[in-house]
UniProtKB/Swiss-Prot annotation:
It comes from Burkholderia vietnamiensis (strain G4 / LMG 22486) (Burkholderia cepacia (strain R1808)). InterPro entries: SAM-dependent_MTases_sf (IPR029063), tRNA_(Gua-N-7)_MeTrfase_Trmb (IPR003358), tRNA_methyltr_TrmB_bact (IPR055361). Belongs to the class I-like SAM-binding methyltransferase superfamily. TrmB family. One of its GO terms (molecular function) is tRNA (guanine(46)-N7)-methyltransferase activity. Pfam families: Methyltransf_4 (PF02390). Its EC number is 2.1.1.33. Residues 1-30 are annotated as: Disordered. S-adenosyl-L-methionine binds at E86, E111, D138, D161. It catalyses: guanosine(46) in tRNA + S-adenosyl-L-methionine = N(7)-methylguanosine(46) in tRNA + S-adenosyl-L-homocysteine. Substrate binds at K165, D197, T232, K233, F234, E235. This is tRNA (guanine-N(7)-)-methyltransferase. Transmembrane segments: none annotated.
Length: 255
């Protein structure tokens, strides 16, 4: 998920024991196995009254329950349109803004934390958005079971948890097995857009994405921020302090 607010990110203290630490050795053999090293830590988080109301009132329409089957996404969205997957939308502000400015595209947001789901649903209600659907589940399992090969027109992964301690780098979301899964689900010519404010993670992203043979970089290395990606409050504050932000935009090679 986006880590704009450390309290929402669910990140443990740097030296805290993590729930699946003991299983790390086995998971590294097959990173997409169901006991793999996860890129997130599930925390309860406080759901506000407004978020709870949005979940109760709008969830039945806009939240798609996870199931290990392929849905009819045209039926889910009520139309056939370009489909963009967003992994880890945080509190949903960027998702809602992008969807509002791109009404011809449909957006599927995947987020594990309930406050973020409630926050995005609240924005959907306030702005009258109809082109967003949400799955509250682990994105890797959603990719494996709910999205068909060559079914996506784009993927957004903005500011995933950086796991900045070296011993936790294996928990970072952008790893070769996940990128291969994402690439397989992109249509030829479709794009994968990642953004991070951690230089070390940006370098890892560039290395991993460049190594995926079915993807090609749209820039020499890092791309200018595309106009459709909003600058978040957290990002704006960081830029004022001289912190960097790195965007990477890759495309699926033609068959």
């Amino acid at each position: 998920m986006m880590h704009d607010d450390p309290n929402e990110a669910g990140l443990p203290p740097d030296d805290a024991a993590l729930p699946d630490e003991a299983a790390d050795g086995a998971d590294e053999v097959n990173p997409l196995h169901h006991r793999r090293i996860r890129s997130f830590v599930t925390r309860a988080g406080r759901v506000s009254t407004g978020q709870r109301r949005a979940i109760d009132e709008l969830g039945p329409r806009f939240v798609v329950p996870y199931a290990p089957t392929l849905p009819d996404w045209d039926a889910v969205f009520g139309r056939s349109a370009p489909r963009i997957l967003e992994i880890g939308f945080g509190m949903g502000a960027s998702t809602a803004e992008i969807a509002a400015h791109r009404p011809g595209d449909d957006f599927l947001g995947v987020e594990v934390h309930e406050p973020g789901v409630g926050a995005l649903l609240k924005l959907i209600g306030e702005q009258g958005l109809t082109n967003i659907r949400i799955i509250q589940h682990d994105a890797v399992e959603v990719l494996e079971h709910m999205l068909a090969p060559e079914s996506l027109d784009g993927v957004h992964i903005f500011f995933p948890d950086p796991w900045h301690k070296a011993r936790h780098h294996k928990r970072r979301l952008i790893q070769p097995p996940l990128v291969a899964q994402l690439a397989a689900r992109l249509k030829p010519g479709a794009y994968l857009h990642c953004a991070t404010d951690w230089q070390n993670y940006a370098e890892q992203m560039l290395e991993v994405l460049s190594a995926e043979p079915t993807l090609e970089n749209t820039a020499a290395d890092y791309a200018p921020r595309p106009d459709y990606r909003p600058v978040t409050k957290f990002e704006r504050r960081g830029l004022r302090l001289g912190h960097g932000v790195w965007d990477l935009v890759f495309r699926k090679r033609a068959a």
